[in-house]
């Protein structure tokens, strides 16, 4: 609370710590750069050798835990990165 008051907050709503959360959607996957941050490989549209390998690629949350999907995408991404490095494109 002291931190909020120090920066001028007039109201704060403390919440208990969460046992776990799934933070999603901050680096949206998209076909076109104007619609998101990364392509289908998790590669950023503007920096060819920068990849995002977490749940932030998801455009929205699903009904189930995203961990296995995140792992699957990361494995697929690792194969793609290895292939691109072998070709000298990144």
Question: What residues fall within each predicted segment?
Answer:
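Internal hydrophobic alpha-helix adjacent to the cofactor/substrate pocket in enzyme cavities
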Residues: 1-7, 74-90
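A glycine-rich dinucleotide-binding beta-alpha-beta segment and adjacent secondary-structure elements
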Residues: 1-61, 67
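A conserved FAD-binding loop/helix module that cradles the flavin
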Residues: 60-79
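Glycine- and aromatic-enriched mobile tails/lids
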Residues: 58-63, 86-90
